[in-house]
């Protein structure tokens, strides 16, 4: 996702109307250049921002991936409580009313789940954290989506590491032995949604969040809230513990098998080396080796 300056630079025109402090403000650009200076207009009770723009056909082709655009608009309706989106791709108007983050999780969950989705939320120092998660029975990978101000942080960041740490800490608190982070992530489906005033990203592509303070906020929220859910929902906790213990056993069995394979390889290498010791004579009759195929 890019900002208004970037969109303006690649648009044939870009107009913005802002409703705030009881007035309407307008500004307009063409080909990235200012053509309508900022103007304070009429009084209004409205709030919000209206953006109109058209991508420059000298930069972009006329072909637009409408399916991708519709998917993004639906994603925005999930991430923003109270938001209504209307769009028309030429075949009639579509209204997307705000849906919950829980609905988003259900939309991306393709396997049978252990229980109902768990939802946690906290606000601290102008930062709001929303987390929704569930576990699937027959899923051995994981799906964790992370967002910051509607930007999909595909490479994760401090909010993701805080989420993982919180999950692990909560499950350790109920006494599961030999547990690792890989064990608790198996079968997990989750969404972490952050709203903050001044996000700090690694690089211009905004794919990785660098905010240690948010890591702690997410970790504390998930650890405390998930621990409470595990304490209150005994059946869910029992089923999840059973699933994780299966993952732990599979990991330990695989580790043991690898160790046994290494020992066998080492023993075989020792025997082969002993039989094929380095030559210490220059006499070919004493140093030659014949390899015969067959019996």
Residue ranges: model-predicted function:
Residues 5-9, 13-295:
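GHKL-family ATPase ATP-binding module
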Residues 1-3:
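Conserved P-loop NTPase motor core
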């Amino acid at each position: 996702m890019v900002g208004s300056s970037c969109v303006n630079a690649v648009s044939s025109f870009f107009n913005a109307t802002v409703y705030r402090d009881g007035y309407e403000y307008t500004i307009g650009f063409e080909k990235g250049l200012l053509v309508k200076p900022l103007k304070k207009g009429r009084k209004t009770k409205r709030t919000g921002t209206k953006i109109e723009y058209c991508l420059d056909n000298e930069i972009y082709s006329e072909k637009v991936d409408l399916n991708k655009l519709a998917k993004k608009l639906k994603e925005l309706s999930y991430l923003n409580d109270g938001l209504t989106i209307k769009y028309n791709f030429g075949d009639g108007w579509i209204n997307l009313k705000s849906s919950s983050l829980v609905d988003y999780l259900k939309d991306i969950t393709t396997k049978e789940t252990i229980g109902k989705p768990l939802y946690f939320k906290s606000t601290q120092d102008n930062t709001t954290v929303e987390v929704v998660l569930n576990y699937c029975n027959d899923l051995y990978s994981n799906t964790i989506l992370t967002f910051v101000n509607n930007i999909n942080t595909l490479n994760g960041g401090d909010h993701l590491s805080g989420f993982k740490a919180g999950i692990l800490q909560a499950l350790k608190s109920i006494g599961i032995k030999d547990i690792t982070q890989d064990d608790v992530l198996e079968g997990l489906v989750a969404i972490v949604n952050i709203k903050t005033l001044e996000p700090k990203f690694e690089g211009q592509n905004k794919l990785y969040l660098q905010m240690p303070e948010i890591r702690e906020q997410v970790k504390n929220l998930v650890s405390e809230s998930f621990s409470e859910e595990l304490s209150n929902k005994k059946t869910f906790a029992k089923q999840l513990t059973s699933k994780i213990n299966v993952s732990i056993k599979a990991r330990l069995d695989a580790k043991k098998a690898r160790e046994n394979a290494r020992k066998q390889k080492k023993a075989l290498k020792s025997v082969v080396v002993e039989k094929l010791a380095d030559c210490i004579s220059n006499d070919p009759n004493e140093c030659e080796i014949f390899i015969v195929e067959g019996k």
